[in-house]
Swiss-Prot record:
GO terms for biological process: arginyl-tRNA aminoacylation. It comes from the Bacteria. It is found in: Cytoplasm. Belongs to the class-I aminoacyl-tRNA synthetase family. The keyword Repeat does not apply. Coiled coil: none annotated. CDD domains: Anticodon_Ia_Arg, ArgRS_core. Its main location: cytoplasm. InterPro entries: aa-tRNA-synth_I_CS, Arg-tRNA-ligase, Arg-tRNA-synth_N, Arg-tRNA-synth_N_sf, ArgRS_core, DALR_anticod-bd, Rossmann-like_a/b/a_fold, tRNAsynth_Ia_anticodon-bd. GO terms for cellular component: cytoplasm. The keyword Coiled coil does not apply. This is Arginine--tRNA ligase. Monomer.
Length: 603
């Protein structure tokens, strides 16, 4: 209902300025007009609410209800508002409850049925985003290390945010900032050369069966063998200087890891462009030079750093963001600054981004706050551009502690996904047996995979990303509650109704639709909130808003399905109700796609 909302807001603003806001108060009005109208907090309050009279009462030192009475009388004289609104009434100390006319809602439903996007508008093409990109930096595993549950959160939250921006019409660049550079490669390459010295001439033939064990063995030698440690440090210098054999060994390690990552991305159906830390190596020196030139960089105890405004240590002293270590080496902050500057730089010398979104765990919040502050002070973030950190909490076990194996190790992501699919298959086979129903192996395998992977994704996305959440296969695979199986089952139910009744868009006669049942209007109002939910996520980057909306939509539809005789009554009544089924199906399918969850025709 964004179109209605905008029209309503504009009319309210015009009426306020014409009738209540005196010239000397217009500057104050500009500060408060942003949230002039909001969605009603409860259904009984109508469709929207306006609390401006409470705010104005403080400015004018007047009774808010008296202001509301005068405002409503003026609003009723506005033709646009009288065409949109069935009722305007005062509630409580001075709230104005707004209820839209039924005919306005029906016209909106007709429009959404015809719209392949279920009423969600494309972003405006005449603004900064018409040529510039939105960059979403997510997933970002490290070479020679296994992807774990922390990478799951970054990967699926980042994927969903990317999908929502793409759906809105933005040019989105999904970047995988993998950890493919750093001092750890010295020990890995040294270990590689020690184990496969004779094969390095034919490096493509080397297969490292278990990179994680290879990493652990390398680390153990580095911690315990002085001579190996010395050679590893020398290897880092050779790698950074571009030694041919070192580069080849480094590429081998990256390629082996990439195969592992790609298997998981295939399972999760994730599309992402790899651009690792190494890509920014040529730009690191210029970061130091630019910060020096702008007199932002300070040398402290041999290291070059920027002291951050408003960020202090326990002693109350300003925190430093170290840009270059005292040994001359660079670190994550240097690379992140180089990446940020490159991404905002215009093409062909950069990505030409208008907005950059980083999806990482909340443990990196201070790091990114420091990086963003330095970038702003260096004027690397254009005035009309935006940068956001999207932090998320930990995945915990049902005991409330960090999710680990029984042995205390971090759970591998591929093992977790396999276990979910396995349990989904077991549940499906039990259900088929209870229903005395036979399905072939392809059906069982595909359905198990869709439910198992979808359940893991949805369980994560449905949480407020900022908080920790407890991982439970039992809860996420349940057919009851706010779960992927519940949504998928509801969608299968609706799709079956529409298939049996040939409810294609071409078959719907929109001119004859009409509604009278209370549950019809509840479903209509829920369906018309879809665009507002999507646009709100674009602003605050909280995908759980879409999950909450879908759960409420499914509950509303199921009450409608159970209590309203959809296929009975006169033909116009039947078509009107089937029209709501068709729009619910479309909205559910689009939404699940935005969450990265595949759908099923049968379960």
């Amino acid at each position: 209902m964004q179109t209605i909302f905008k029209e309503l807001t504009k009319s309210f603003e015009e009426t306020l300025l014409e009738s209540l806001i005196k010239n000397e108060k217009k500057e104050e009005f500009e500060k408060i007009r942003k949230n002039l109208i909001n969605q009603a907090s409860k259904e009984e309050f109508g469709d929207y609410q306006c609390n401006i009279c409470l705010v104005l009462s403080k400015i004018y030192k007047s009774n808010p209800r008296e202001i509301a009475i005068a405002f409503i009388e003026t609003l009723k004289e506005n033709k646009k508002i009288s065409n949109l609104c069935e009722n305007l009434e005062i509630a409580g100390p001075g709230f104005i409850n707004i209820k839209l006319k039924n005919k306005v809602l029906i016209e909106a439903i007709k429009s959404n049925i015809k719209c392949p996007r279920a009423g969600v508008p494309l972003s405006h093409k005449n603004n900064i985003y018409s040529k510039k990109k939105v960059i979403v930096d997510f997933s970002s595993p490290n070479i020679a290390k296994e992807m774990h549950v922390g990478h799951l959160r970054s990967t699926i939250i980042g994927d969903s945010i990317s999908k929502i921006f793409e759906f809105r019409g933005y040019i989105v660049l999904r970047l995988n900032h993998i950890g493919d550079w750093g001092t750890q490669f010295g020990m890995l390459i040294t270990q590689l050369k020690d184990l496969y010295s004779s094969d390095l001439k034919e490096i493509d033939r080397i297969k490292i069966s278990d990179l994680v064990e290879f990493y652990k063995a390398s680390k153990k030698r580095f911690d315990n063998e002085t001579e190996f440690q010395k050679r590893s440090r020398e290897e880092v210098v050779q790698l950074q200087s571009g030694d041919k054999k070192s580069i080849e060994a480094w590429k081998l390690l990256c390629n082996q890891s990439r195969k592992e990552f790609d298997q998981i991305y295939k399972t999760l159906n994730i599309k992402i462009k790899e651009r690792g830390e190494s890509f920014y190596n040529p730009f690191l020196k210029s970061i130091i030079e630019d910060l020096n030139y702008k007199k932002i960089l300070i040398e402290d105890q041999g290291a070059k750093c920027v002291f951050l405004d408003g960020m202090t240590n326990k002693e109350g002293n300003p925190l430093p963001l170290i840009i270059q270590k005292k040994d001359g080496g660079f670190n994550y902050a240097t690379t992140d600054l180089a990446a940020l500057r490159y991404r905002f730089t215009k093409e062909p010398y950069g990505d030409n981004a208008a907005r950059i979104i980083y999806v990482t765990d909340h443990g990196q919040s201070n790091h990114f706050a420091g990086v963003f502050q330095v970038a702003k002070r260096a004027n690397w973030i254009p005035k009309d551009c935006e940068v956001n950190h999207v932090p998320f909490g930990l995945v915990q076990g049902i005991d409330g502690k960090k999710l680990k194996t029984r042995e205390g190790d971090t759970i591998k992501l591929k093992d977790l996904l396999s276990e979910s699919v396995k349990r989904a298959k077991e549940d499906l086979l039990k259900r088929l047996e209870n229903e005395s129903r036979f399905e072939n192996d392809d059906f069982v395998l595909n359905t198990s995979k869709v439910i198992g992977i979808g359940a893991v994704k949805y369980a994560d996305l449905s949480q407020n990303r900022i908080t920790n959440y407890q991982f439970s296969f039992e809860k996420m695979l349940s057919l009851n509650g706010n779960t992927a199986p519940y949504l998928l089952y509801t969608l299968v139910r609706i799709s079956g109704i529409n298939r049996k009744n040939n409810m294609t868009e071409e078959a719907i006669n929109l001119e004859s639709i009409s509604y009278s049942h209370d549950l019809e209007w509840k479903l209509i109002r829920k369906l018309l909130k879809f665009d507002e939910v999507i646009i709100s996520i674009e602003k605050d980057l909280m995908p759980n808003r879409l999950c909450n909306y879908l759960f409420e939509l499914c509950k509303t539809f199921n009450r409608f399905y159970d209590q309203v005789p959809i296929l009975k009554g006169e033909i116009d009544t039947k078509i009107s109700r089937l029209t709501l089924c068709a729009l619910t199906e479309k909205t559910l399918k689009l939404s699940l796609e935005l969450l990265g969850i595949e759908t099923l025709e049968r379960m």
